């Protein structure tokens, strides 16, 4: 089961928490859910260069609080905070309510699964060899304290006629262990030969306390567990296009 399910969804309520944190009546739930999706799509499109890891949306009474976790917060804030104020006004138009905007810096983007996946996808679009991009990402993650990392790249890799999936792993990535702090992220690369998918799993150590906010608190404080290497594995599997 752990091999197939989304590692974040499997650990919700154990050591991970939701990115949308609010309650709503039955009649309003669908409207607010679509509003969240619209906000996230808009931010990902407008702030593509800011390397956004995730967007957390909270809704106190008749208000909306949006927290953007990004590796380059300066690009969001702008000169003297001009850009962030424009962004806040745009979000107020979308939500039609008082909106507060917070920016949180991702201190170690090399061990953030979403940012690693985005980086590899951008390299594939620039025609950098996928093996080199994967290996470089793995080495950076292990050097900065990850206990294990696995990367999957699938599609017409290197312009091959038959699509396939290749993976690279270093250290350990225990997908079945619920107390394991496993970060997961995906990205798509729009290459000349079609779309290539990138999946990344990063194991940052174990969280022994039963606390849904533990993983986020650890990431915010920059206290990712430091771990050793482990054996290096590479694998390759062909799949039909």
UniProtKB/Swiss-Prot annotation:
Signal peptide positions (record): none
Any one Pfam family match given in the protein's UniProt record, by short name: Ribosomal_S3_C
GO cellular component: cytosolic small ribosomal subunit
Complexes and interactors: Part of the 30S ribosomal subunit. Forms a tight complex with proteins S10 and S14.
Name by which UniProt lists this protein: Small ribosomal subunit protein uS3
Primary role: Binds the lower part of the 30S subunit head. Binds mRNA in the 70S ribosome, positioning it for translation.
GO terms of molecular function: mRNA binding; rRNA binding; structural constituent of ribosome
GO biological process: translation
Xref: InterPro entries: KH_dom (IPR004087), KH_dom-like_a/b (IPR015946), KH_dom_type_2 (IPR004044), KH_sf_prok-type (IPR009019), Ribosomal_S3_C_sf (IPR036419), Ribosomal_uS3_bac-typ (IPR005704), Ribosomal_uS3_C (IPR001351), Ribosomal_uS3_CS (IPR018280)
Region called Disordered, residue ranges: 214-241
Record key words, sorted: Ribonucleoprotein, Ribosomal protein, RNA-binding, rRNA-binding
Family indicated by similarity: Belongs to the universal ribosomal protein uS3 family.
Domain KH type-2, residue spans: 39-107
Taxonomic source organism: Mesorhizobium japonicum (strain LMG 29417 / CECT 9101 / MAFF 303099)
């Amino acid at each position: 089961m752990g091999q197939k399910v989304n590692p974040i969804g499997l650990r919700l309520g154990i050591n991970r928490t939701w990115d949308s944190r609010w309650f709503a009546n039955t009649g309003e739930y669908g409207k607010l859910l679509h509003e969240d999706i619209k906000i996230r799509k808009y931010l990902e499109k407008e702030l593509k260069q800011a390397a956004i890891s995730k967007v957390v949306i909270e809704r106190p009474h008749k208000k909306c609080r949006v927290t953007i976790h990004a590796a380059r917060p300066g690009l969001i804030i702008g000169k003297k905070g001009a850009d962030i104020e424009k962004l806040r006004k745009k979000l107020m138009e979308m939500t039609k309510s008082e909106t507060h905007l917070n920016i949180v810096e991702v201190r170690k983007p090399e061990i953030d699964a979403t940012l690693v996946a985005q980086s590899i996808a951008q390299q594939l679009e620039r025609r950098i060899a996928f093996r080199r991009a994967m290996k470089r990402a793995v080495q950076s993650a292990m050097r900065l304290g990850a206990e294990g990392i696995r990367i999957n790249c699938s599609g017409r890799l290197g312009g091959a006629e038959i699509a396939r999936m290749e993976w690279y792993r270093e250290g350990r990535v225990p997908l079945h262990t619920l107390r394991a702090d496993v970060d997961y992220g995906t990205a798509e690369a729009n290459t000349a030969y079609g779309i290539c998918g990138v999946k990344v799993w990063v194991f940052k150590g174990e969280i022994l306390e039963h606390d849904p906010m533990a993983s986020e608190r650890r990431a915010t404080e920059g206290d990712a567990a430091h771990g050793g290497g482990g054996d290096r594995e590479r694998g390759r599997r062909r799949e039909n296009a």
